[in-house]
Amino acid sequence: MNMSTQLLYNDFPTFLRKYFPYKVQKISLNAGFTCPNRDGTKGWGGCTYCNNQTFNPDYCRTEKSITTQLEEGKCFFAHKYPEMKYLAYFQAYTNTYAELEGLKRKYEEALTVDGAVGLVIGTRPDCMPESLLRYLEELNKHTFLMVEYGIESTCDETLKRINRGHTYADTVEAVQRTAACGILTGGHIILGLPGETHDTMVAQAEILSDLPLATLKIHQLQLIRGTRMAHEYDEAPDGFYLFNEVEEYIDLVIDYVEHLRPDIVVERFVSQSPKDLLIAPDWGLKNYEFVARLQKRMKERGAYQGKKYRDSEKRIIFADDKLTTE
């Protein structure tokens, strides 16, 4: 097969086109939640790597209503794509960690904003009570809905070290329960967490492939100023491997994707943080520049998603904007 026609991996824009005949953009929201490993329920201080300022746009302020945040987010994109529609992305902290009626009000307020065509709800695998899941199951019948779980690692030792406050068994249960309700279920993982080797991380792809995940976000570990992990790095830098050369990370990602189930949609490969907060790694690349390098390297290696996945019998290819298999 000609490598130029092959779909190197299942990408998110192609996935969205299955649901929407128009351009769709996520708008991040900060709805004023916290996390059980921050407020003392399961721990204090939150995840050791976390500083929510790294992914909250300027319009995300808890003193602003959901409607105001969405309207300001729309203004940010409208000048370039006036016909664009939006997904309200409840991103900051744990967006299911509150009383049910309050959650319903926030979700439903977002859906009343003109141009909002669905919800993406980011949360933890230990914060999906049955009552909320039943509500989301019903909501899913009326609007586009995706629940995105912060998995971060499949290794319980790592999860404990980074103060997640949950286990991988919690992830398995939450993902299975959510997907069983017919809800699109996504995951988020971090490559390069302390104590994890190249082989450990690549093996993780096969483990996650056993779950009914529709999408997966991958990103590199970033050291962020003011976090507990940044302090740990100052104390013992030898315990960290930060992919200071982008080529090393690209090759790891390719190895990972080759072992990933072919139908999982890979939503992203890297995270970007404000320069004033980022300690390392700083590759000086925009997301599209990273993706271009990744795709070039995949073609050089003859790599594609699922190439080494244990149950892979078909190759997914891309031709004339249509997904096909051979």
Predicted features along the sequence, with ranges:
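Acidic (Asp/Glu)-rich catalytic clusters
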Residues: 77-79, 106-114, 134-144, 176-180
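Structural recognition of alpha->loop->beta junctions
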Residues: 47, 109-116, 203-218, 291-305
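Hydrophobic faces of well-ordered beta-strands that scaffold small-molecule active sites
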Residues: 25-29, 86-88, 119-121, 145-149, ...
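Auxiliary Fe-S-binding modules of radical SAM enzymes
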Residues: 2-16, 20-25, 215, 223-326
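Conserved C-terminal portion of the radical SAM core fold
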Residues: 169-229, 247-270
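N-terminal [4Fe-4S]-dependent radical SAM core
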Residues: 1-87, 325-326
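Generic structural signal for well-ordered alpha-helices
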Residues: 67-74, 103-108, 133-137, 171-175, ...
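Core AdoMet radical
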Residues: 53-73, 77-100, 115-128, 144-171, ...
